[in-house]
Amino acid sequence: MGLPWYRVHTVVLNDPGRLLSVHIMHTALVAGWAGSMALYELAVFDPSDPVLDPMWRQGMFVIPFMTRLGITNSWGGWNITGGTITNPGLWSYEGVAGAHIVFSGLCFLAAIWHWVYWDLEIFCDERTGKPSLDLPKIFGIHLFLSGVACFGFGAFHVTGLYGPGIWVSDPYGLTGKVQPVNPAWGVEGFDPFVPGGIASHHIAAGTLGILAGLFHLSVRPPQRLYKGLRMGNIETVLSSSIAAVFFAAFVVAGTMWYGSATTPIELFGPTRYEWDQGYFQQEIYRRVSAGLAENQSLSEVWSKIPEKLAFYDYIGNNPAKGGLFRAGSMDNGDGIAVGWLGHPVFRNKEGRELFVRRMPTFFETFPVVLVDGDGIVRAYVPFRRAESKYSVEQVGVTVELYGGELNGVSYSDPATVKKYARRAQLGEIFELDRATLKSDGVFRSSPRGWFTFGHASFALLFFFGHIWHGARTLFRDVFAGIDPDLDAQVEFGAFQKLGDPTTKRQAA
């Protein structure tokens, strides 16, 4: 046939059997990739430290999606929260991966069968005997079935009526676990951070899909609408399907990047806005203030801060710090976190407490500036020592660490104080192992960043695909050069320009 590479899909344009075949093969490839990727991730995943080396630090991409739907156990005898188990059951991580691979194989065989046996009676129009698809009817069937699946997921899986529920956590990502969720039917259901909205929206959308599917199965489209929207053309289906996909991709790119109940920070890592707004820092200080109000010592209150909460408050976990094209997991960047060294408290020689200004997200370097409680600069690490007035040496800054491994340790020598001041720019201070993975010290993004970038990019690409194919199907007659009002019988090939008798071809 000699088709160029960008026109090869025309071979299934008027061949319903093989159109079905290539879609089944596509499903086989997607399911096969998902299962294979899951097995690969399980082979390299280290579940030993869910607090300081969680899945998102290790660059896991499909494990978080399985976990948020209720999978927590492995045939390896471990649980995602750090415990050990004896009977993981069929629906473990490996079980889900295996199910995808088996399903992929079955789809592969089905695709081959439909490619070989393409000329089925079901695809033939009884009136003409030619291959034909009743596209509005097929649309109704698909809408009905997807509505049933959507309703079933919300009413049974999420609510725990017949299923495990979904991953639910507190606002600071400390207590996450899989549990049933009750639908939220009030205005709170529209809050993207309320898990109950996931159940109620799936139930509502599923009900709407079922009703709309039944409508399209029982009511034929008006002739003018059918012709106006080119409902008989398979490229119309392609265009509208691409629209649905790019819209969904834009939505999930947003819920992933800005955060929502569907993208818990325990599974995908914190968002950049939690660093920008000092979200975890404020919660830590709130807990410390509450402890001090109860007459506890600084050492006691900081020792009660969960290591998990302190670890979120570290710039290396900010997905916007890693470049989009830096390959590898976060652990390959700044290293594997080993332990929290403690929270540094700086004071000048008058005993006034000083706070290090934190590095904004999009800075690679930032001046080390220490301010007091009123925001007045009291000390810094100068660029030119000869002109400095508030250097660490001149002001006599000391540092004491609370909580963590260095609880109660203090330093007064300027070199050590400046070292901890530089590290305090990056949030809470952690010991990081760079040797094990030969980490290069350059920050990486988390799967949250990869997912967002990938889906936003493909959504933009698919948006143009929707415009392209929509224009092709709506203006097909214009692009073909045929006047839609032409009622004369035209012999194809008789004229250089179709239907123009002044351009009659000369006989050779």
From Swiss-Prot:
Keyword Translocase (UniProt): no
Alphabetized Pfam families for the sequence: PSII
Keywords: Chlorophyll, Chloroplast, Chromophore, Membrane, Photosynthesis, Photosystem II, Plastid, Thylakoid, Transmembrane, Transmembrane helix
Cell compartments where the protein resides: Plastid, Chloroplast thylakoid membrane
GO process terms (BP): photosynthetic electron transport in photosystem II
Domain of life of the organism encoding this protein: Eukaryota
Gene Ontology molecular function, alphabetical: chlorophyll binding; electron transporter, transferring electrons within the cyclic electron transport pathway of photosynthesis activity
Oligomeric form and interacting partners: PSII is composed of 1 copy each of membrane proteins PsbA, PsbB, PsbC, PsbD, PsbE, PsbF, PsbH, PsbI, PsbJ, PsbK, PsbL, PsbM, PsbT, PsbX, PsbY, PsbZ, Psb30/Ycf12, at least 3 peripheral proteins of the oxygen-evolving complex and a large number of cofactors. It forms dimeric complexes.
Protein name according to UniProt: Photosystem II CP47 reaction center protein
Organism: Aethionema grandiflorum
